């Protein structure tokens, strides 16, 4: 179904995989390795999920993160999105053509100034981190006034990006427990509690994140859809 596509090329994976691993150091070296990961349970055969994931990516992630080893046309064909619908709702750059690579327009210098480093390309992020990590990470932001963007993340402590899905989830509050660390008591964030300000209920938000992760897994290896 194309009902999930609303509102505002060919990938040479083997050639670029080493380069992209080098471009993702912040993700590959993220802390929080001992945090239990929730199962994403995404389904690459679910076209409606993939379409919604593409919509979420373009609306909430693409302003900063590209998937520059994909082409709009390949995505439209693979996800069964009509080309006119793709152009109207998912290609925001008026100069971009359907056959172009999915590169965003944010200048690298500006991105480095705003975030401390250029936001990484996400074509292969699901390969680098895994779908369970992504699914848990996107559901683990919490309010932290001490951080530059007002949020932190259980899976990725001291994360250097805002909670881009805040509109959907709201800003969860941290849940603390006191634990002994090296013989001293420390307050540790062990979970989050949603504040009810997001557009989606918890189950709806989890489903949206699953769709986004589904799209990112597809992005990392489009040939999986042929299996």
Residue spans of the language-model regions?
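The canonical Cys-X-X-Cys-His
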Residues: 57-68, 212
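Juxtamembrane amphipathic/hinge helix adjacent to a transmembrane helix
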Residues: 202-226
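Electron-transfer interface patches adjacent to heme c in soluble/periplasmic c-type cytochromes
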Residues: 80-154, 159-182, 186-205
